[in-house]
Amino acid sequence: MTTRIDTKFAELKAEGRPALVTYFMGGDPDLETALKVMKALPKAGADVIELGMPFSDPMADGPAIQAAGLRPLNAGQTLAKTLYMAAEFRKEDDTTPIVMMGYYNPIYVYGVERFLTDAKASGVDGLIVVDLPSEMDAELCIPAMKAGINFIRLTTPTTDDKRLPKVLHNSSGFVYYVSMNGITGAAIADTAKVGEAVRHIKKSTDLPICVGFGVKTPEQAAAIATHADGVVVGTAIVNAIAGELDEKGKVKGDPVAAATRLVHALAESVRATRLEAAQ
């Protein structure tokens, strides 16, 4: 199968530049605002969109993304509404890949077969489910592959040579390298070490390698872009949105403008870095 993710990374490889992968939480701070953010991301320079699935117990996420998940849940966001966001986005954009990211519990409650059917119909291209290891491929990974949806794995600095083949087995779309041990939003690791890790993983797979966790500024994104096929930015975008909300999580400023300003700066920095490196 060839998905929008495969097509996008092939296009970017031909252009000689990495992808900017942007994460935000579905329904944050409310459905209407979040959908406006989603539609604005590609125009600001996002190549791939990671659409967060709100969950009450996000064990891998730091305070910013935890709060970003609780705001939409408190406003009535459901997995069905997050899928609705993807479907509405697809009415205007049929090329930007959508990767839904989150935890297995909401999918399990929704029903795996029903979820995959609805995700495919909504234009979702890939899944990142952080609490499903490769030993549980039969739960969701293999059914997703059969449905034509990429299943994207996380690798970390502690993924050793014995574990790596298991992580890569049945992976598709791209590999998400977590730049450090810890939760989302923590400090970025040494970029030289990130480069070493990416080169090591590439010995075992032809899939693109995207690096995330801790990338907050255009300068950090540029540094990572010299080593990776893609740079993932999440917490910084979530914080940009949160900065336009009042203490109750309601819109007081312009979350869409704040998010797009940041993404535009990130995109310019990422693209310029690779162009400079290629000259």
Curated annotation (Swiss-Prot):
SUPFAM superfamilies per record: Ribulose-phoshate binding barrel
Gene label: trpA
Species per Swiss-Prot/TrEMBL record? Brucella ovis (strain ATCC 25840 / 63/290 / NCTC 10512)
Cite the active-site annotation.
E50, D61
Which residues constitute the signal peptide according to the record?
none
One GO term in the molecular function aspect is: tryptophan synthase activity
Tell me the enzyme class: lyase
What pathway does the annotation place this protein in?
Amino-acid biosynthesis; L-tryptophan biosynthesis; L-tryptophan from chorismate: step 5/5
Which PANTHER family is this protein grouped with? TRYPTOPHAN SYNTHASE ALPHA CHAIN, CHLOROPLASTIC (PTHR43406:SF1), TRYPTOPHAN SYNTHASE, ALPHA CHAIN (PTHR43406)
- Top-level division of the source organism's lineage: Bacteria
Q: Describe the task this protein carries out.
A: The alpha subunit is responsible for the aldol cleavage of indoleglycerol phosphate to indole and glyceraldehyde 3-phosphate.
What family is it from? Belongs to the TrpA family.
Q: How does it assemble?
A: Tetramer of two alpha and two beta chains.
Name of the molecule in the record: Tryptophan synthase alpha chain
Q: Which reaction does it catalyse?
A: (1S,2R)-1-C-(indol-3-yl)glycerol 3-phosphate + L-serine = D-glyceraldehyde 3-phosphate + L-tryptophan + H2O
Q: Which GO terms describe its cellular component?
A: cytosol
